Amino acid sequence: MKAIIAGGRIPRYHQYADKMSPKEYIEGVKRREIHDPTLSFQISNDFQVKLVSKNYLPEDNESMGYATILVWHNIYYEPDQSLLHSRKSYVRIGCVQWQVRPYAKMEDLMESVEYFVDAVSDYESDFILFPELFNTPLMGSFNHLPAVQAIRELAKFTPDLVEAFSKLAISYNVNIIGGSMPMIEDDELYNTSYFFHRNGKIDFSHKIHITPSEEYEWAMKGGDKVSIIETDVGKIGILICYDVEFPELGRILADQGMQILFVPFLTDTQNAYNRVRFCAQARAVENECFVAIAGNVGNLPKIANMDLQFAQAAVLTPSDFQFPVNGIKAEATPNTEMIIISDVDLSLLVELHNYGSVQNLKDRRKDLYEVKLKPAVKKPGTEAQNNGI
């Protein structure tokens, strides 16, 4: 059953008819300033008053002839779907805690990537998340160059890496969040996360907020698009490392229907990691979504700006009775190369949105404040570009 539509009496309205209109009476019942034996019961069971009908029952003197037209929506209703188009409730996520080590060639790096993709796909995972700038070991060949030139040399690998990742997503039937890679667009350098659909489609998102180190060492620029990605199992968002520390971005994605937020990160110290971790946990609570984070571990002593790494991958949840008491669904051992795999139940988010102990999204005071994305400013001489490839 999808919904119930009903007409209802307001039997105590006759006691207030000389003081207020039917609509004012109904608002008083909603605020619990007035108790109506019929309407109070209906409202407490999530019936919503859509309109007031006059002369619905003229002989109902207690209701003064008025009646409410109410609607009750069944949040558990699922329309019949063919097996080809149905979406499952449980989604399996794999996070790679990636050990940085020297690689002489791109092929050597991709051999390690394929190992993890193969391992995660063996568990029939829907997603695999790699860390931010996981491919920086390839910069070792450019140690003789200034950092700002070395990172641009690294960006030259990106087109080939994108092609290789896309083939893996198709071959192993798993959606891949390819961490992030440097990308050159219109001669500007961006920190870009690619999403490789297992059907062959590719989406990408630029990092919005560039850290002082990225700007000073590498002259990176921030992107200007924030949008969810529709996948075969749900709606996801990607925020790269520092971006998760800005709650506005998570809220914009939540308003677009995001169910899972993926955060590839790169942090050098435990302090930096905790900033990402604590903010990721907050995004899960305030946006009523799951959050998966994954970072690099180990050391790259001969590569400028990449010498230290600290990480602890995790899958985080909202905080309510349906979820783990500490909001942690799965967690890696700190600073150890490994994979974590966890199932998340998207149907629990629907339950939380409607019946949670608190309802952060629903209870916002939109009469007082709002968070919205401004239109992207188009660069002179360029056309607006889509997120997809």
Q: Where do the model's predicted regions map?
A:
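C-terminal beta-strand edge segments of enzyme domains
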Residues: 297-389
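Terminal substrate-recognition subdomain of acyl/acetyltransferases
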Residues: 2-89
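Cys-nucleophile CN-hydrolase/nitrilase-fold catalytic domain and related Cys-dependent amidase chemistry
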Residues: 106-198, 267-282, 286
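Short beta-strand segments enriched in small/hydrophobic residues
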Residues: 86-100
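CN hydrolase (nitrilase-like) catalytic-core segments centered on the catalytic cysteine
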Residues: 155-177, 245-337
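Short hydrophobic alpha-helix segments
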Residues: 53, 199, 205-206, 327-333
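Active-site catalytic loop in hydrolytic enzyme cores
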Residues: 167, 183-260, 269-282, 358
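Short hydrophobic/aromatic beta-strand or adjacent loop that forms the aromatic wall/cage
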Residues: 64-70, 190, 224-226, 308-311, ...
